[in-house]
Amino acid sequence: MQVSDFHFELPDELIARYPQPERTASRLLHLNGNSGELHDGQFTDVLDLVQHGDLVVFNNTRVIPARMFGVKASGGKLEVLVERVLDDHSVLAHVRCSKSPKPGNQLWLGENQEYEAEMVARHDTLFEIRFTSEKKVLDILDEIGHMPLPPYIDRPDEDADKERYQTVYNEKPGAVAAPTAGLHFDTDILEKMKAKGVEFAYVTLHVGAGTFQPVRVDNILDHHMHSEYAEVSQEVVDAIKATKARGGRVISVGTTSVRSLESAAQHALKQGTELAPFFDDTEIFIYPGYEFQVVDALVTNFHLPESTLIMLVSAFAGYDNTMKAYDQAVNHQYRFFSYGDAMFITKKTS
């Protein structure tokens, strides 16, 4: 398939620049993957769509305030976007400035250039940066970093984003982009789901800035996915097996949870074993023709045209169903992308 097969026209006014006043106030488009039926609704309809005995899998990564501003020794301004925290004092980052720093160059980061750092090495398009402070990197980021809003939100981050560009169940810091399907859940709806007999499990995938990179090839088979770190614990594996055994569904909240679970499944297939814990980097690329091993239903936001995420949704729901759903979403004025509305999709099995 061609990347252009996943194109759709999106009016600029449908891109959500701010979240709804309440997390659950978004709309929800329900897509039945087998019949192709579409139903417009509200996000709170999730309570009717999940069933007793289902397992809902969330990504518990925490978004770090990964964007920093500062200057080089020459005085030139620069912007640093952390891609990954390497240890307590070092990060791998994207650097934007007029002239790329070289190994050994000093950087001063923060509004008042309060933190000194050194450019240690360059790794392809990323820079390894080490802070000289005794403070830990995560503490420095909490002090001087900005929330790394996606480029299409196209506004400076605000104080409210520290809460709203973060799930209520976040636990493990490391992401530089939110697992956005999870932004719709508040504590009230989670408690109501539990009261209904729905079980929860948590994987971790630290979403990287690569999730916003455009696909730069024509044929999707030529695309190489960026690498992200994922964790699927023994507890999650046991919960999945128990759910399948009782006839329940595994419902993934977000494409990052899908990629975590299916990475574990693909690793097990290659090893010739049953589903097992997975703690590793993954470059899994899911596109039409992929056979899902774990996930039965998916909660996800509306994604960018020609992105790997709309390809994943097309693999899950069927290409024609997906493009029809996106056409309806545009016509019915759904809000798109990170702060936008959501879909609930059951897998196409026939």
Curated annotation (Swiss-Prot):
One of its GO terms (biological process) is tRNA wobble guanine modification. GO terms for molecular function: S-adenosylmethionine:tRNA ribosyltransferase-isomerase activity. It is found in: Cytoplasm. Pathway: tRNA modification; tRNA-queuosine biosynthesis. InterPro entries: QueA, QueA_dom1, QueA_dom2, QueA_sf. It catalyses: 7-aminomethyl-7-carbaguanosine(34) in tRNA + S-adenosyl-L-methionine = epoxyqueuosine(34) in tRNA + adenine + L-methionine + 2 H(+). Disulfide bonds: none annotated. GO terms for cellular component: cytoplasm. Transfers and isomerizes the ribose moiety from AdoMet to the 7-aminomethyl group of 7-deazaguanine (preQ1-tRNA) to give epoxyqueuosine (oQ-tRNA). Belongs to the QueA family. Monomer. This is S-adenosylmethionine:tRNA ribosyltransferase-isomerase. It comes from Aliivibrio salmonicida (strain LFI1238) (Vibrio salmonicida (strain LFI1238)). The lineage of its organism: Bacteria, Pseudomonadati, Pseudomonadota, Gammaproteobacteria, Vibrionales.
